[in-house]
């Protein structure tokens, strides 16, 4: 059952800004020993995120698995999946897809990353309304300053 959905609103519309923010959010959750699924909009986006998770930080990398290429490994804590379909169970779902994922209710926490792209904002508002109508607790966060200046 979903306990909370956090909407992170980014100021720009560059794909790399959303992806970098998703990586940083994933790293933070990973360091707290959480299981994370990053749901991308496409297989191509998942492959780009796959590369970025290895290189986005000079200090570290995030071990992960592309679940669309093979069944989930039980020891893996970070999964990348492309919509559609139900990604593996996890503590946190980072949603970069344009729609609610299948079986979204099984994730205790969901992070929706919304940028300034007009269509993504519109779809994000639709998801916000859906969650709200289903009485899921929601929080909205403005992008942190370092995303605003380095995005």
Segments and roles (model prediction):
Residues 39-42, 81-83, 94-97:
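Short His-Asn-centered micro-motif
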Residues 50-89:
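Helix-adjacent hinge/juxtasegments
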Residues 86-105:
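SF2 helicase motor core recognition
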Residues 37, 92-94, 111:
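Conserved beta-strand elements of the Class I
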Residues 32-35, 45-62, 134-137, 151:
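Terminal and domain-boundary regions
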């Amino acid at each position: 059952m979903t306990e909370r959905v956090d909407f992170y609103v980014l100021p720009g519309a560059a794909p790399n800004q959303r992806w970098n923010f998703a990586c940083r959010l994933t790293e933070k959750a990973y360091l707290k020993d959480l299981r994370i699924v990053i749901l991308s909009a496409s297989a191509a986006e998942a492959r780009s995120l796959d590369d970025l998770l290895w290189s986005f930080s000079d200090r570290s990398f995030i071990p992960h698995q592309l679940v669309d290429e093979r069944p989930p490994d039980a020891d893996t804590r970070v999964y990348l999946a492309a919509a559609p379909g139900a990604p593996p169970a996890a503590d946190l779902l980072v949603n970069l897809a344009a729609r609610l994922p299948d079986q979204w209710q099984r994730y205790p926490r969901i992070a929706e990353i919304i940028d300034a792209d007009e269509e993504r904002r519109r779809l994000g508002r639709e998801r916000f309304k859906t969650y709200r109508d289903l009485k899921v607790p929601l929080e909205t966060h403005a992008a942190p300053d370092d995303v605003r200046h380095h995005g």
